[in-house]
Design a protein with these regions (language model features):
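C-terminal outer-membrane beta-barrel translocator/porin domains of Gram-negative envelope proteins
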Residues: 2-221, 226, 231-235, 239-242, ...
Length: 247
């Protein structure tokens, strides 16, 4: 919570609405990191500490994200990548490019662990080397097309779709394998990790999800000398689908 300051502020505001135990608070009446805030969240989620339904949903959402971001994950898998580019050389201004990546993780590990009857965690998921391994299918596709318009201008189009589906030993996708939105190479109206998921209000500094759709189109042109300009539109977002997380 020292890093996720927005999440801390949200929980801290909620705690100030109630008769929170003084042992959870510092001299400024703020939740102590990590002991105070962890204890407060634990009691709210387990319903030992009564709050409104709206506050409970907010705390429960932040707790799910905390567990997802801080949990240890063992990822054993393989991937296949394909790329097809029509560009002949660096001076070719009219070209297209298609990329495809498929990643499958945890299947062989799951088969082996079931045969060996390995230990399980508190949720009944198999563990290997003391860690719950991830099992998922992830695909990414991207397409780029450039069209020259005259000598010093062109139109550039890019689209991307990605989805990661957990199954078997997993209910969600590890943070390192999830998608994010925003930033200078994505949806430029938002800072990196600040957009989504879905229509949520971005309670966290690092918002991620397991499905992403992005598209942008640009008109690039020469202004003067080495000074170039561009007019662009960006579309897209991230969403949580087929997992245990709701937007």
């Amino acid at each position: 919570f020292n890093i996720y300051s927005n999440s801390f502020k949200s929980v801290n505001i909620i705690s100030n609405r109630y008769n929170t135990p003084s042992s959870y608070l510092d001299i400024n009446n703020n939740l102590i990191i990590p002991s105070g805030i962890d204890s407060f969240i634990s009691e709210v989620v387990s319903k030992q500490f009564a709050v409104s339904n709206e506050d409970f949903n907010s705390i429960n959402y932040l707790n799910d994200r905390k567990n997802r971001l801080t949990s240890n994950n063992l990822i054993i898998g393989s991937s296949f990548s394909f790329s097809n580019k029509s560009r002949k050389n660096m001076y070719d201004n009219e070209f297209s490019e298609f990329k495809l990546k498929i990643e499958l993780a945890g299947n062989l590990t799951n088969l082996t662990s079931n045969l060996l009857n390995v230990s399980k965690d508190e949720f009944g998921k198999n563990k290997v080397l003391g860690l719950t391994y991830s099992q998922f299918l992830k695909t990414e596709t991207g397409y780029i097309k450039h069209w020259p318009i005259g000598l010093n201008s062109k139109i550039a189009f890019r689209t991307f779709f990605g989805i990661a589906i957990p199954f078997g030993n997993s209910n969600s996708i590890p943070f390192s394998k999830s998608f994010f939105a925003g930033g200078s190479n994505d949806n430029r109206a938002w800072e990196v990790y600040r957009l989504g998921p879905g229509s949520s209000e971005a309670l966290s500094e690092f918002n991620e999800a397991n499905m992403k759709l992005a598209m942008n189109i640009e008109y690039r042109f020469k202004i003067l000398g080495k000074l170039d300009g561009a007019v662009f539109s960006d579309f897209g977002n991230i969403w949580n689908v087929f997992d245990n997380t709701e937007d």
